[in-house]
């Protein structure tokens, strides 16, 4: 309804190929949910998955707790970390120039132990493309300068630091162009604890 849409007449493109799922029945169910056209049959399929008295077995299975509140997620992750007997290692972000705390993509301080369940929070910027945002794994080796994660597909990844950029955009109305300038960076290992995550962080992930 914005005026800019009426003036620009944008071209709308619908993405209609699903890459993350291959089960046609599941894809159809997801489409019904997306289009608010859920049938009684599809609802019955979903309800079969509901187990009201379910209790995950501690450390035995790769269950992830989803919560609407960061405080609950942090409490669960802290509790699970404390239960691990391994030595803890702490890693600090490197922040250069202008990068306000409100823009931090993750905590400035990352503490890990061998056995910690983690999630990558950025796509691998190297040519190998070993991980992507949302990929899950377990920390299998740590040192002061290295982090090794074994992912759910058994791929072993030596994690390197990634850099997020704070980009300032300026427009040149005379030339009808937009210029970009990197005014700050945030560099850290792109991992977060993942025994529990917020529903917001889980959006778009496949478990």
Q: Model-predicted segments: where are they?
A:
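Conserved ATP-binding/catalytic motifs of P-loop helicase motor domains
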Residues: 1-207
